[in-house]
Amino acid sequence: MVQWVEIDGRRHHLVGGRLSHAVANPTWNPIAKPGALHSYFRGNPDGKNPLELLKDREPLPAAYVDRDARLAVVQEQGLEAVWLFPTLGVLYEELLKDDVEAVGALMVGFNRWLLEDWGFDYRDAIFGSPYLSLADVDLAVAELEWCLDQGARTIVMRPAAVWTVTGPRSP
């Protein structure tokens, strides 16, 4: 359902057979520097386009892909704990919304990856947030129970109408 494709030397995601432009660089390498949008979220006093602010980039730091490196940064910053919330896992539900079975597979697959790579409660300091979709309520309930059994303390859901086999439902 999510595949890598290369077009004109750049990698992109193909989601449900459709080219995704949700993220300009889904490899995240290089990535915009931390705080790149600070002025934008403080009222954008210079009236800059947010895409312009994201052009200052750096190589992908290890702390963005390795939980032990992230834990070291958390400790260096004097933080007790952090939450991790997904981006692409939630974004891609929109592209798959017409295929409830694919949305369910995306949700389950994402949560297994998250648990394996980051954990839902890694050393009581990094709390990965599993993703739930209500497209299939029975599957969502089973997945929530599984996530809670694995130590999840938070969840995340797409803030939009839910698409079911009978069409959209208001949240």
Protein language model features and the residues they cover:
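Helix-coil boundary/capping segments in enzymes
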Residues: 1-171
